[in-house]
Amino acid sequence: MTLRVAWGITGSGDLLPETVAAMSALSETQDVEITAVLSKAAVKVVRWYKLTERVESFAKAVLIEEDANTPFIVGRLQIGRFDCFVVAPATANSVAKIAHGIADTIITNAVAQTAKSNTPIYVLPVDQREGTTVTTRPGGERLELAIRAVDIANSRALAEMEGIQVLAGPEEIADAMRECSRRRSEQQ
């Protein structure tokens, strides 16, 4: 049975190419149907990284945020039309909002409302470890960023939230989808 995945993308360039590659590989190796949900910021960043066509090539649908509740993805997540919700990569801003109950974008609202249901949520925060991280800019140049203590604290708070599983990296997405599939099988 096809696994139906809602994939929320925020405005992070960090881990974006790796996440797109992981989701693309998932679509090729597992029986999944992916609906991409892009925040307003994600549209710009995905375009900046020249990944729009790649996402469109494997996603069944690509939904673009108009406001926090449009397109209306929340209802489909709550009633089980999707087997799980993956938010990857998640910016420090989105993680902070989720951790503190702010639901003012399509992604943060979808997480807040989905957490009230039985639909599993998997989130990949970009800022999880102390120190510096090296990411790649759209042109391939390296960019070193210092991770703020507040962002790490918000990622930890997110990990403590009921119904949300924090992923350490894009390489954990396939395992999370296998877990989601197993959970769905147990519920049937």
Predicted regions mapped to residue ranges:
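A cross-family phosphate/adenosyl-ligand binding-site feature
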Residues: 1-188
